[in-house]
From Swiss-Prot:
GO cellular component terms listed in the entry, alphabetical order: cytosol
PANTHER family xref list: GLUCOSE INHIBITED DIVISION PROTEIN A, PROTEIN MTO1 HOMOLOG, MITOCHONDRIAL
The protein's name: tRNA uridine 5-carboxymethylaminomethyl modification enzyme MnmG
Ligand binding (FAD): 13-18, 125, 180, 370
Compartment annotation: Cytoplasm
Length: 629
């Protein structure tokens, strides 16, 4: 039986990817349906109760710059905020928030339930309905079918999910939730490459049984940051500390003695786990020279007694988990309320996706989140946003959009996945971006908000505030450029008192601000340059743009050189086999990956510069040498 209403877009899954996808298409004024197996777990933080961090915070800011929800939810649920790498350059500074799980979930649900053009329906999806090679809808477990012009699948760890605790295992999407078995079977019948990955989570501890008095405290920043451009410190709930303990020789002995009961070390788990979030078993074996590992005890909320021990993710049996926990300082009498576990799940090779996250094999079907081989809430949300945007553009028969590597970390993430693929859970780092000085947290709105406005994602209030900020930046730069200080000025002595070397030539405000000993606050305390601008965000942009001008211009020149052929399009039906000069290996890889541009082709492992030159020559010969936008 078909549902009485038809939809433009159906989103399957109510996690971080699904919520951003559904909100994006609904904001684009498209009739959207979000299907979830449980409405009460919309926006659930399945693992660590935190948002942001190195690289991840950049993604959150980009999602926010394009009208997404994650930053706002973090601001309203964050119970400890910190700016990481605060002593380093602006490119690698990152915001991180410890979040209250309940508050976060509430913010997400309220946003979804109050979003125009968005319906929510609780039911497990068991099949994707296809006509030839195009998606036309979905079928649910109860037999009810829904028609749609496009479908976004954000299944997380639910596809054929299997939970492991010791040598025991059972089907599950995460603790307390069923796996999506039928849909996983149906998807395996499609012309898509599928494999298995693994992730894990630590046991949760009862805070009432922890001796916090003997543990080191970690407080958030005194000057609290915010995630959202439209956010404020006043939105933050009560701020509380985290605590720090350590593993020790006793902990490590317990782990080593019980490896024969570990599903990872006995071969029961075949999926590959996240490199940058290893289990405690992995850490003890891989870093055998270390006799201690730092463990952060992170509260799960203001109204919860659960504590998340960040650093002891494990799939060892429960009795071993108890010994591990009780071996650590402050946790000698601690009680576990939820056991840790590992989970294996299906993921699809992201090289079978276009850069829009639409599957190459099935028109109108988009994948986002862990189904594409990533790990992390932020990576999932970023993909959900992009998949939602492109599902919406697909329905409207408009040109698709995806950011370039020099435009956003979302662009880096998607290009890495779709070009190179991944055999282990992929996470974003600032080190993955070639042009990270341009991809800072602080300028995410400048990079992306104008684009998001054209896509229909930005409301009038945000747009007006964004334009005011841009105007403030330009006016202040003009003001600083127009004020000159010369060696005969009556203000010379005032300036020389703060300068490391006295003025010997005429300079303007921007020249002075470039000096390492001068910042905006110091500059605008000088009589000629008073008063300081009140817009703190605009001030930050003015200072960074001036101080890093040379470096920024150098990166922009590098981008222009790279762009010369980066966007040179390769036709979808281009015949690589008939190009003389390409090795069989290169030809096979190009046939397999089907890159859409020369830039994408150049990032495929094994594709040499010589092969790229041959490709360009042949594209020119065949009259196909066209540059993308």
């Amino acid at each position: 039986m078909f549902y009485t209403e038809n939809y433009d877009v159906i989103v399957i899954g109510g996690g971080h990817a699904g919520t951003e996808a559904a909100l994006a298409t609904a904001r684009m004024k498209l009739k959207t349906l979000l299907l979830t197996h449980n409405i009460d777990t919309l926006g659930q933080m399945s693992c660590n109760p935190a948002i942001g961090g190195i690289g991840k915070g950049h993604l959150v800011k980009e999602i926010d710059a394009m009208g997404g929800l994650m930053a706002t939810a973090a601001d309203k649920a964050g119970i400890q905020f910190r700016t990481l790498n605060s002593s380093k350059g602006p490119a690698v500074r990152a915001t991180r928030a410890q979040a209250d799980r309940v508050l976060y979930r509430q913010v997400v649900r309220i946003a979804l339930e109050n979003q125009p053009n968005l319906d929510i329906f609780q039911q497990e999806v068991t099949d994707i309905i296809l006509e030839k090679d195009s998606v036309t809808g979905i079928e649910t477990k109860m037999g009810l079918k829904f028609r749609a012009k496009s479908v976004v699948l954000t299944a997380g760890t639910f596809l054929a999910g299997k939970i492991h605790i010791g040598l025991e295992n059972y089907a599950g999407g995460r603790a307390g939730d069923p796996a999506s078995v039928n849909l996983a079977k149906k998807l395996r019948d499609l012309n898509l490459r599928v494999n298995r990955l693994k992730t894990g989570t630590p046991p949760r501890i009862d805070a009432r049984t922890i001796n916090f008095d003997i543990l080191a405290k970690q407080y958030g920043d005194e000057k609290l940051p915010v995630f959202s451009f439209m956010g404020s410190v006043e939105q933050h709930p009560e701020q509380i500390p985290c605590y720090i303990t350590h593993t020790n020789d006793q902990t490590h002995d317990v782990i080593r003695k019980n490896l024969d009961r570990s599903p990872m070390y006995t071969g029961v788990i075949e999926g590959i786990g996240p490199r940058y979030c290893p289990s405690i078993e992995d850490k003890v074996i891989r870093f055998s020279d270390r006799n201690s590992h730092q463990i952060y005890l992170e509260p799960e909320g203001l109204t919860s007694n659960e504590v998340y021990p960040n650093g002891i993710s494990t799939s060892l049996p429960f009795d071993v988990q108890m010994k591990i926990v009780n071996s650590m300082k402050g946790l000698e009498k601690a009680r576990i309320v939820k056991p840790g576990y590992a989970i294996e799940y299906d993921y699809f090779d992201p090289r079978d996706l276009k850069s829009t996250l639409e599957t190459k094999a099935i028109s109108g079907l988009f994948f986002a989140g862990q189904i594409n081989g990533t790990t992390g809430y932020e990576e999932a949300a970023a993909q959900g946003l992009l998949a939602g945007i492109n599902a919406g553009l697909f329905v409207q028969e408009k040109e698709s959009w995806f950011p370039r590597r020099d435009q956003a970390y979302i662009g880096v993430l998607v290009d890495d996945l779709c070009t190179v693929g991944t055999k282990e859970p992929y996470r974003v780092f600032t080190s993955r971006a070639e042009y990270r000085l341009l991809l800072r947290e602080d300028n995410a709105d400048i990079r992306l908000t104008s684009i998001a406005r054209k896509l229909g994602l930005i409301d009038d209030i945000r747009w007006a505030r964004f334009n005011q900020k841009m105007e403030n930046i330009e006016l202040e730069r003009q003001r600083l450029r127009s004020i000159w200080l010369h060696p005969r000025s009556e203000y010379l002595n005032e300036a020389n008192e703060i300068l490391k070397s006295p003025l010997i030539r005429e300079v303007n405000g921007e020249d002075l601000l470039r000096r390492p000993e001068i910042n905006y606050q110091i500059l605008t305390a000088l009589t000629p340059f008073k008063p300081a601008m009140e817009d703190k965000e605009a001030v930050e942009q003015v200072e960074i743009a001036i101080k890093y001008q040379g470096y920024i211009e150098h990166q922009q020149e590098e981008i222009e050189r790279q762009k010369r052929h980066e966007n040179t399009a390769i036709p979808a039906n281009f015949d690589y086999k008939n190009i003389s000069g390409l090795s069989n290996e290169v030809c096979a890889k190009l046939e397999q990956y089907r890159p859409i541009s020369i830039g994408q082709a150049s990032r495929i492992s094994g594709i040499t510069p010589a092969a790229i030159s041959i490709l360009l020559v042949n594209l020119k010969k065949q009259g196909m040498l066209k540059r993308g936008e």
